[in-house]
């Protein structure tokens, strides 16, 4: 009986963790905020990478309209509104600063008109760094860290918006495996 319980922990526990987005945000020693979210997907590293780097897979979870040009200096463009196109001004365009295949994807976050002009003018360092860590041949940890936040009341509101929005988005990703 003891071995059955141990087997259940070994085989079931990793899949239970895959059902949650864990907020592990923190403040660095220099006082900078890091919005950090972690989740474990019950899929291999190559499949997890494709969820972030192919149009078809992005459209399953990030937005109904999504396109990626995977290269340094490339971009991801999305639109959450099914009545609009990627050419519409409401689309969100994230520049790909760099990537290391199946390990790292760094995106430049450019705030749109949903945010105050002040934070839009100060968003030069705002980035999302996405890490892909192989836990096993059938399990991949995703760590999303947003860095480059400003320090004001308006920036606090922007940070809070992304806490809610990013948790929601990564929960949408996890729903593919529930």
Question: Model-found features: residue ranges?
Answer:
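Bacterial Sec-dependent N-terminal signal peptides
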Residues: 1-24
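Hydrophobic/aromatic beta-strand elements that line small-molecule binding cavities or substrate pockets
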Residues: 37-39, 91-98, 125-134
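A short, structured loop/turn motif at beta-sheet edges
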Residues: 42-46, 97-105, 131-141, 175-178
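Hydrophobic pocket/interface hotspot
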Residues: 48-49, 58, 76, 96, ...
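Short beta-edge strand/loop motif at the mouth of beta-sheet-based domains
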Residues: 56-91, 99
């Amino acid at each position: 009986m003891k071995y059955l319980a141990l087997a259940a922990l070994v085989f079931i526990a990793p899949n239970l963790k895959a059902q949650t987005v864990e907020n592990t945000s923190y403040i660095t020693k220099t006082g900078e905020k890091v919005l950090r979210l972690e989740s474990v997907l019950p899929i291999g590293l190559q499949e997890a990478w494709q969820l972030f780097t192919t149009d078809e897979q992005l459209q399953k979870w990030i937005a109904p309209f999504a396109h990626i040009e995977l290269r340094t200096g490339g971009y991801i463009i999305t639109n959450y509104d099914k009545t609009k196109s990627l050419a519409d001004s409401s689309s969100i365009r994230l520049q790909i600063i760099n990537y290391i295949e199946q390990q790292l994807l760094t995106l430049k976050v450019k705030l749109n008109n949903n945010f105050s002009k002040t934070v839009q003018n100060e968003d030069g360092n705002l980035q999302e760094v996405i890490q892909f860590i192989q836990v096993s041949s059938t399990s991949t940890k995703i760590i999303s860290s947003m860095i480059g936040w400003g320090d004001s009341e308006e920036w606090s509101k922007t940070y809070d918006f992304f806490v809610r929005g990013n948790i929601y988005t990564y929960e949408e990703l996890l729903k593919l495996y529930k």
